[in-house]
């Protein structure tokens, strides 16, 4: 169980599909991915097939603006993995998060 409404989940998924590749994936992680925790911003982890940093930045910004318009002005953090970069936050987000797409 996660601490987002069905509407918020649906809007995250619909908005994500507008800005990222069909093969890309998104996870919710952090406190909102744990039903026992309280508060917290919406932490999203994305794995994308975009290879160009400018494309990643444009997709991220478009996604963030459209998502805030859809669900309201909430604190949303987005971590994106592209190319072959792998960091600890990527591993934690994927292991402890809940895949939405």
Residue ranges of predicted features:
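Catalytic core of pol beta-like nucleotidyltransferases
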Residues: 1-27, 33-39, 48-101
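Short, well-ordered beta-strand segments
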Residues: 43-45
């Amino acid at each position: 169980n996660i601490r987002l409404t069905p509407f918020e989940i649906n809007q995250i998924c619909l908005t994500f599909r507008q800005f990222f590749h069909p093969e890309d994936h998104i996870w919710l992680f952090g406190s909102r991915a744990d039903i026992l925790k309280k508060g917290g911003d919406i932490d999203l982890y994305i794995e994308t097939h975009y290879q160009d940093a400018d494309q990643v930045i444009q997709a991220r910004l478009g996604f963030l603006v459209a998502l805030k318009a859809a669900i309201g002005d909430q604190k949303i953090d987005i971590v994106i993995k592209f190319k072959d970069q792998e960091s600890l936050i990527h591993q934690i987000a994927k292991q402890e998060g809940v895949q939405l797409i």
